[in-house]
Every structure is written in structure tokens, then in C-alpha cells.
Amino acid sequence: MPIHLECMSHTPLHGYFDPAPEVVAEVERVQRVARERVDAFDPELVIVFAPDHYNGFFYDVMPQFCIGVRATAIGDFNSAAGPLPVARDVALALADAALASDIDVAVSYRMQVDHGCAQALDVLTGGIDRYPVVPVFINSVAPPMASCRRARLLGDAIGRAAARMNRRVLLIGSGGMSHEPPVPEIAAADDVVAERLIAGRNPSPESRNARQSRTIAAAKAFAAGDSRLHPLNPAWDRALLELLERGEIAAADGLTNEAITRDAGKSAHEIRTWVAAFGALAASGPYAASIDYYRAIPEWIAGFGAMHAHEQTLSRR
């Protein structure tokens, strides 16, 4: 059965601190066209590769990869909230497939996903509960982190399993590109912040609002040029987009953690979600890909990109 891919940056700042109206309109147009492709494809299963921002995964036990068997969206930054319609048997089968390929993936029967997962589902499918879904968490912010090569191999294992299913499968990669929002690091954290990074589940509304306010303030400073956050790197972003467009997914193995942080910022590690999604698609053979959008958007502290792809045996959608 056919497999279709959509990869897109996400931002929690949309609606809180926006760029010029014409830029917002550009992004929303790209999102609308992507949604139309998904509607036309009419998936029977959605596999979404997504990061987390210390909302669902913490240092009490920080897996590199985790497949949700049951999952709930927490609704941070006014993103969609509520239970996800997880295809449980499929989730467990994908976990078995990953383990059989020597990818040590965890499973969760109480996964909490934040805007990094929920926004992609909402934008691309019209909600978080429209299609059966399997959420796949990829650690992209909490060192030590697995390599891009391991993310690709995770995608490959999941893609080979998905290709054997008699279903139309939509692959989503949510995250990236170059960006470095104000995410704390446990190595330099005081005791209070460290405890939040270790065991910060289900914070009070006041605590969550304070965190969101800090992010908005950081975005305003970044857009004004008054910030120590890592600058956006459009050249790096475009090089990655073009690599994926050419079908050279294995070349992503050469992206080291140190180089990603140095060149694109500490949260650019979210491109692992794209690498995993393209790895899953490439498991079925050569693919045809299109770069749909790219713009560096300082107000969202993000290099904002979008791509779609499908197997070469299918007509281009």
C-alpha cells in the first residue's frame, strides 16, 4: 500500500508573537496545501515522529526513542489537547520490529505529547483524533542524545514494518530546523530547575504560563537582535532540505551532535524527526520529494521548513 510523507517545522509561538502578516499568510498557505494533500491521500494510519520539550519526557528516565501505545496531548501553548486514537496493536508491532532490528526503543502506555506532536497532527490532518495514529518520540533536547544515524535506522525499521501493512500510511516528521529557544540544560541548572527537568510532569497552570511567558519574551528579544541565543542558519537548513530532496538520506549519518549544536543551535537536533521519517519512506525504495517552503522566521526563533515526499512508483501528488 502507498506511503506518503509530510515534514514540517512547528512553532508554539504562532498566535503569541507573530512575524509580519504576509509571512504568517505564507506559512498558513503552505500548511493548507499540505493538509489538502493529506486529505487526498486519506491515510488509514498516521505515524508521527516528534520531539518533546520537557513536557512529557524527563530525566527521571529519558529514553532516546519511545513508541506510544496510549497517548494524550497536554495542550501547551493552546495546542490541541486530549487523548490520541493510538492504533495499539500497530504500535506494539512497530516496537517489535524496531527491537528485531537492534533498535532499543521503549514503549509507553501513558505517553504525554506536547505541541511538537499535536500541532503537526492538527495542522496536517485537521485534528489530533481524525486518524489512527502511532506517536514516536525522538529525544532531541536532552543530552546525551542518540545520533542521526540511529534515528534513520529507527525510521528504516518502522518503515519496513509499515510497508508490510495493508494500509495507506502517512509519515509525519515534526520539528527543526535551525533554532535555539530558551531550553534549560541540566548540566548548568540550579536545584529547582534540575528538579523540573527530572520530574516536571503535570505542572500547575501558573508554572506552565510562566514558562510560556519566558519563551515569548525570549522570542521578542531574539527578533529585536537583543539575544544570546544561537542565530538561525538558513544555509545549513537549505543544505539539509536539498540533501533530503536528492534522496541522500544516508548522508544524514554524518551529522554529528556536536556539529548540529555548533552550526544550527541546540534545538536543531529536532531534525532527527525528519531523518527518521525519510528513513521510513526510503525503506520502501527510492522516493520523490519536494521542498515546499523555507524561511528563517526570527519571531518564531525558527528556520521554518516544509517538505513532502512519496514513493517514486506513485504519481506525484
From Swiss-Prot:
The keyword Iron applies. Gene3D superfamilies: LigB-like. It catalyses: 3-(2,3-dihydroxyphenyl)propanoate + O2 = (2Z,4E)-2-hydroxy-6-oxonona-2,4-dienedioate + H(+); (2E)-3-(2,3-dihydroxyphenyl)prop-2-enoate + O2 = (2Z,4E,7E)-2-hydroxy-6-oxonona-2,4,7-trienedioate + H(+). The active site is at H115, H179. Its EC number is 1.13.11.16. This is 2,3-dihydroxyphenylpropionate/2,3-dihydroxicinnamic acid 1,2-dioxygenase. Catalyzes the non-heme iron(II)-dependent oxidative cleavage of 2,3-dihydroxyphenylpropionic acid and 2,3-dihydroxicinnamic acid into 2-hydroxy-6-ketononadienedioate and 2-hydroxy-6-ketononatrienedioate, respectively. The gene is mhpB. Homotetramer. Belongs to the LigB/MhpB extradiol dioxygenase family. Pathway: Aromatic compound metabolism; 3-phenylpropanoate degradation. GO terms for molecular function: 3-carboxyethylcatechol 2,3-dioxygenase activity; ferrous iron binding. GO terms for biological process: 3-phenylpropionate catabolic process. Its cofactor is Fe(2+). InterPro entries: DHPP/DHXA_dioxygenase, Xdiol_dOase_suB. Pfam families: LigB. It comes from the Bacteria. Keywords: Aromatic hydrocarbons catabolism, Dioxygenase, Iron, Oxidoreductase. The keyword Iron applies. It is an enzyme of class 1 (oxidoreductase).
